[in-house]
């Protein structure tokens, strides 16, 4: 696992924050949040999960959220981290949930930014897509398609030039040397996301938990192949955020109105201020 371990700038407050990136993201996409948390006195650990970015992309691997959580736990043990705050975005929100369920004594607080998995897609009627079908889809990834998807879903139809670097990051991985391994691991990870819901276990989270939700997000795995009547019910974050916040015993919700899937990238100053204020409560 590749990772960043960023010490607190100035006066350390003694707390650690582990960042869990999303499916189309890397640890590097947390850059403004890492800086804000470090300046606020936190030690920040931001790994690339196995299968992503700077980490190994094995030819044969049984992907599960439990396995990725175990990998992350082993990394934290190696770094001497006993207690931590966990912050996950998108697919990283599903992983953060699983991590908090597996290691509740270690997790002081849990925060999730537009986590996917606020609904169980297969239970709602989204058709199954095989790993080979995902693989074929991933091999076709190009900048134009990624840019259009991110503009619509991540930024609610808006675009700024600074978003382009994250398009090129993703496309570079999928078009560069080793792109077949990247696509294969991506396919295995999509299968994990679809088949391993965490939705039914939110009620078991016992630590203070914050949902940070851009309410114009429409992300839903498999919505592109779902029947119209199913697709119409998926990915409504304006409804999913409040619903799931009520399922979590110590759940809180902060809504970023009018924003999409990545408020930490779209409005980093506001997002980071909101996060640091909640952590300081």
Regions found by a protein language model. Give the residues of each.
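Catalytic active-site module of serine/aspartate enzymes centered on a nucleophile-bearing elbow/loop
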Residues: 238-281
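Conserved catalytic-core motifs of eukaryotic protein kinase domains, centered on the activation segment
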Residues: 29-31, 55-61, 121-124, 222-223
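Flexible "cap/lid" loop of the alpha/beta hydrolase fold
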Residues: 97-101, 108-141
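Active-site loop/oxyanion-hole signature of alpha/beta-hydrolase fold enzymes
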Residues: 6, 39, 49-87, 91, ...
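Structural signature of beta-strand start/N-cap positions in the alpha/beta core
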Residues: 16, 41-43, 82-85, 106-109, ...
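Helix-loop "lid/cap" segments that line or gate small-molecule binding pockets
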Residues: 146-160, 171-174, 186-191
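Conserved HGGG/HGGXW glycine-rich cap/lid loop of the alpha/beta-hydrolase fold
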Residues: 2-54, 274
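Conserved serine/cysteine hydrolase catalytic core
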Residues: 175-246
């Amino acid at each position: 696992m590749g990772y960043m371990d960023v010490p607190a700038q100035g006066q350390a407050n003694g707390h650690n924050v582990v960042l869990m990136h999303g499916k189309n993201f890397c640890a590097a996409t947390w850059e403004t949040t890492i800086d804000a948390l470090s300046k606020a006195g936190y030690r920040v650990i931001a790994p690339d999960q196995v299968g992503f970015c700077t980490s190994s992309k094995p030819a044969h691997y049984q992907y599960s959220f439990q396995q990725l959580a175990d990998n992350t736990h082993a990394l934290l043990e190696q770094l001497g981290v006993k207690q931590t705050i966990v912050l996950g975005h998108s697919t990283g929100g599903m992983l953060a949930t699983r991590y908090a369920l597996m290691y509740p004594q270690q997790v002081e607080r849990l925060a999730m930014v537009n986590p996917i998995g606020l609904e169980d897609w297969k239970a709602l009627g989204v058709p199954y897509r095989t790993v080979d079908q995902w693989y074929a889809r991933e091999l076709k990834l190009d900048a134009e398609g990624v840019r259009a998807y991110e503009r619509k879903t991540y930024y609610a139809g808006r675009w700024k030039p600074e978003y382009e670097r994250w398009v090129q990051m993703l496309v570079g991985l999928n078009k560069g040397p080793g792109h077949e391994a990247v696509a294969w691991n991506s396919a295995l990870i999509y299968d994990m996301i679809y088949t391993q819901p965490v939705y039914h276990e939110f009620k078991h989270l016992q630590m203070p938990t914050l949902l940070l939700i851009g309410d114009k997000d429409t992300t839903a795995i498999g919505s592109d192949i779902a029947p119209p009547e199913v697709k119409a019910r998926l990915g409504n974050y304006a409804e999913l955020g409040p619903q799931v916040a009520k399922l979590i015993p110590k759940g809180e919700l902060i809504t970023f109105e009018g924003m999409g899937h990545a408020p930490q990238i779209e409005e980093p100053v506001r997002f980071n201020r909101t996060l640091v204020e909640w952590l300081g409560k």
